[in-house]
Amino acid sequence: KGVILTAKHHDGFCLWPTQLTEYCIRNTPYKNGQGDIVRELSDACKKYGIKFAVYLSPWDRHQANYGTPEYVDYFYKQLHELLTNYGDVFEIWFDGANGGDGWYGGAKDSRTIDRKTYYNYPRAYKMIDELQPQAVIFSDGGPGCRWVGNEKGFAGATNWSFLRAGEVYPGYPNYRELQYGHADGNQWVAAECDVSIRPGWFYHPEEDGRVKTVDELTDLYYRSVGHNATLLLNFPVDRDGLIHPTDSANAVNFHKNIQKQLEKNLLAGLSPKTSDERGKAFSAKAVTDNDYDTYWATNDDVTSATIEFDL
């Protein structure tokens, strides 16, 4: 379990005292300009045994030089700061939203970039592998884990953990297929389902009565984790910098509900029946033997099979 902090969103404001722009927490009243939200959350994660990760938006609607090679260097310097100053980072989250309207350097403008080539993402992968080799890299196409193709928190009922290598990139236009993965893929890129506990990603007091209920959150769990994906649940902090009490209570009770529903393994010890199996080494018993290294498999010429449990 871990926390992913939005260290910089599309607006370009940095929640850490970066040395690269004045548009950051250093120039706010918070702690008289001595604050560092990234540091505070990283330290809290260490204290409570939670993994820490960062979201860094490639798109920056504030920087005057966005769309030029100089901005790309700026972006990588920011990434370097986050990778080297806050201890272990378990995931780096790159958004696929890039280019568009903004107040670039104070001038209202629209910028267009080539999403496939502009950021030179192999440079990011190399930097992350060198500085945080254990970190999972998230983007539309990974390479560590992928976007699921929607922001509603669910994966397809059939969801392959594979993509065709080199085909999907941040800003990939055929993103809806990411909900299912590629059955003929050759690169392991598991899906991550992102969704907010509220109607949107940011806090609005008028939405205090529209927080997802325990039942709604439980349904999302089964349609994400239950569909071979991970669940990333967004919590918009309120104007006091806190998670609203309703959001917090619903999340805690959601966790309790899942624990209660899954406390007993209904299939443990059962001997299922199958329409086909590849000998004793890959028999149906492997499904319920509680051993992650064993599995049921069919013969090579069988592409459709059934498994039946008698409860």
Regions found by a protein language model. Give the residues of each.
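Mature catalytic domains of secreted/periplasmic carbohydrate-active enzymes
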Residues: 1-288, 295, 299-300, 309
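Extended extracellular/luminal ectodomain segments enriched in beta-structured repeat modules
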Residues: 302-304
